């Protein structure tokens, strides 16, 4: 459960991220594909090379979904309901991949905004990413 302080921390971090959705999203995906190669299996039709237009476009969607969750931080489940349906029913993405993606996103945030990612903010952002992952996997059950 996100506390009021967690929500404030997450919203503050995302003020730094919003203008970089495509770049940070692409970097997150590239990092995930490199660090966890089995995650590539869900993207057989993508050009997975650095700078790929497909990676940039999907990265922008990923960060866009996170921004949507931040904008509706008191109702993440409602905000991401359609995305949850898509991943559970059509794409059937292994739920562990959301955790891996979240870890890679944290690294990207740390690289680009090291002074913002204090231990307290890191904990808040991690809790938020876990909450998003839980919403995206809730309909698997």
UniProtKB/Swiss-Prot annotation:
Red blood cells. Residues 1-141 form the Globin domain. CDD domains: Hb-alpha-like. O2 binds at residue 58. Transmembrane segments: none annotated. Heme b binds at residue 87. Keywords: Heme, Iron, Metal-binding, Oxygen transport, Transport. PROSITE patterns: GLOBIN. One of its GO terms (biological process) is hydrogen peroxide catabolic process. InterPro entries: Globin, Globin-like_sf, Globin/Proto, Hemoglobin_a-typ, Hemoglobin_oxygen_transport, Hemoglobin_pi. GO terms for cellular component: blood microparticle; haptoglobin-hemoglobin complex; hemoglobin complex. One of its GO terms (molecular function) is peroxidase activity. Belongs to the globin family. Heterotetramer of two alpha chains and two beta chains. Involved in oxygen transport from the lung to the various peripheral tissues. This is Hemoglobin subunit alpha-A/A'. It comes from Gyps rueppelli.
């Amino acid at each position: 459960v996100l506390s009021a302080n967690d929500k404030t921390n997450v919203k503050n971090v995302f003020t730094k991220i919003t203008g970089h959705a495509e770049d940070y999203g692409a970097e997150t995906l590239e990092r995930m594909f490199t660090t966890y190669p089995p995650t590539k299996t869900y993207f057989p039709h993508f050009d997975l090379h650095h700078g790929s237009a497909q990676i940039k476009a999907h990265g922008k969607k990923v960060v866009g979904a996170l921004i949507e969750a931040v904008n509706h931080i008191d109702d993440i489940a409602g905000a991401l309901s359609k995305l949850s349906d898509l991943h559970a029913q059509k794409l059937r993405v292994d739920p562990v991949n959301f955790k891996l993606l979240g870890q890679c996103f944290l690294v990207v945030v740390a690289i680009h905004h090291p002074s913002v990612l204090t231990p307290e903010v890191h904990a808040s952002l991690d809790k938020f990413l876990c909450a998003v992952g839980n919403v995206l996997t809730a309909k698997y059950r």
